[in-house]
Amino acid sequence: MSGKQDLSPLGLYSSYDPTKGLISYTSLYGSGTTVTFEELQIFVNKKITQGILFGTRIGAAGLAIIVLWMVSKNRKTPIFIINQISLFLILLHSSLFLRYLLGDYASVVFNFTLFSQSISRNDVHVYGATNMIQVLLVAAVEISLIFQVRVIFKGDSYKGVGRILTSISAVLGFTTVVMYFITAVKSMTSVYSDLTKTSDRYFFNIASILLSSSVNFMTLLLTVKLILAVRSRRFLGLKQFDSFHVLLIMSFQTLIFPSILFILAYALNPNQGTDTLTSIATLLVTLSLPLSSMWATSANNSSHPSSINTQFRQRNYDDVSFKTGITSFYSESSKPSSKYRHTNNLYDLYPVSRTSNSRCNGYPNDGSKLAPNPNCVGHNGSTMSVNDKNGAHATCVQNNVTLNTDSTLNYSNVDTQDTSKILMTT
C-alpha cells in the first residue's frame, strides 16, 4: 500500500465542475439530505453581501446625521425632524439586521438542517424587532415625502392642486405603511408559531411596489418643479440654472436614482441578486430626503438661482434688504412679524403677466389695507404703495419705485425705517 493518500482522478479533468459536488448530511428530513457546494456558496455570498450592505447603511446614515446637523440652520422645523428620525431609524434597522445575521436564526446550520434547538428566543425577538423598525422607517419616509408635496404646493394660487396631490400622496403612503405592517405581522406570526415555516412574500412584494410608486410619484413632482422653475426664471429674465446645477438637482434632489433602482429590482431576474437593490434604493431614498427637502422648500424667484435651503422651511421670497440691490418679486424683513398674512404665488411657477393690471399694497399690523399711492406708477399702469413692517413710515417716491418690462422690481431711495416688504396682488 502506498504511503500517499490516493487522489481523485476527477482533478485531472478540466471539464469537471466542483461546485456540483454533493454534501450529504443529516437534517430535519433525514440522514440522506444532500446539497451542492454551489447552493452553499450562494447562501454564504448572500449573507456576506447583506452584511456589507447593511454595514454601509450604518456608516452612511450616521455620517448623514452628523453632516445634516452641522449644515442645518434651523433644526426645529418639522421636515428636519422627520428626516433626522428617518436616518436614525435606518441606522437602528441596519444594526438590528446585522445582529440577526450574526445570530443562529440566519446561520448556515439552521437554514440547511432546520434543527431549531440552537435558536433562542432572543434571536426570534431580534427578528421581530427588525421587521417592526422597518415599518417605522417606511412610515417616516412616507411622512417626509407627503410633507414635501404639501410644501411645494402650499401657495395660495395652488391650494386646489396641492390638496389633490397631497391627498394622493397621503393615501399612497398610508397604504404602503399598512402593507408593510401586515407583512411584518404575518412574518412574526409564522416565525413564532413555527421556526421552520417560510413567510409568504406576496404582501412584501405589494408593499415594495407601493413604496417604489411613492418614490416615483415624488420624483415626478420634484422634476416638474425644476422644469417650471427654469420656465419661470426665463420668463422673469433672471439668471438661469447652469447645466451642472440642473444635473446636480436631477441626480441628488429629485430621488431619480432610488426610483431607477426600485424599477430595476422588479425588472431584472431576482436570481441574479437584484433583491438587494430594494435595500440599496431604500438607503438612497433616506439619504436623499434632506437634499430633496432642500429643493422642495427652496424658492426660485431670487436673482441668483439656488436649490439649497438649509433653513428647511418654506421660502417664497428673498430675505434681502432694499440696500443690497438684489431684488425680486418678494422681499421680507429679516425679522418678520407673525401678524402678517402673506399673499403670494408660491415659487412664481406662473408669474404675473406683463400686461396684467397689478397693484402693490402694504398691510399694517392692525390688518387694515392702505390706499395705493397714486403718485407711484409702474410701466404697465400698475399703482403701488410701499410700506415697512410697522405700516407707519412708508412713502412712495414717484419714479423711484418702478415695475420694469422684465417683471422685476428695482428699489431706490425708499423711505423706510426697516427692511420693507412688497406683496404683489392681482
Curated annotation (Swiss-Prot):
Main location class: membrane
Coiled-coil spans in chain: none
Protein name listed in UniProt: Pheromone alpha factor receptor
Annotated InterPro entries: GPCR_STE2, STE2_TM1-TM2_sf
Gene name per UniProt: STE2
Family named by the database record: Belongs to the G-protein coupled receptor 4 family.
A Pfam cross-reference name: STE2
Keyword Transmembrane: yes
Compartments in which it is found: Membrane
